[in-house]
């Protein structure tokens, strides 16, 4: 009984960590050759990221004055996919992924509550 409770708790803990980066791996395969996805790396300057990815569809200030976040819309075969690139206060890429800036901010808020 004790072992099954521990196993269940460990399984739940492992799965809860996955809940914060909800990204479809198919999106990465579909858009992997897009300059925004392929070439933008953590630590890159905002200027260089904008040169590679082009102008963002919108830019947001991150909560807590942590930096800014650019929303992009990737297009392929009639399908639109949101993609965000977040920059720290030094205008360096700190994260990116297949979601909007608003979804990214929500994930950050949920993680900080834990």
Residue ranges and their predicted role:
Residues 1-6:
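Bacterial N-terminal signal peptides that target proteins for export
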Residues 8-11:
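Regulatory sensory/coupling modules that transmit signals to nucleotide-handling catalytic cores
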Residues 14-17:
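C-terminal motif of bacterial Sec signal peptides marking the signal peptidase cleavage site
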Residues 19-114:
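Residues within mature, well-folded domains
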């Amino acid at each position: 009984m004790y072992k099954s409770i521990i196993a269940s708790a460990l399984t739940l803990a492992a799965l809860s960590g996955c809940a914060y980066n909800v990204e479809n791996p198919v999106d990465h395969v579909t858009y992997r050759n897009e300059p925004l996805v392929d070439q933008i790396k953590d630590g890159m300057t905002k200027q260089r990221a904008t040169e590679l990815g082009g102008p963002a569809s919108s830019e947001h200030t991150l909560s807590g004055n942590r930096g800014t976040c650019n929303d992009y819309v990737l297009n392929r075969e009639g399908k639109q996919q949101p993609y965000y690139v977040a920059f720290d206060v030094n205008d360096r890429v700190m994260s990116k992924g297949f979601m909007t800036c608003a979804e990214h901010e929500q994930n950050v808020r949920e993680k900080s509550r834990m």
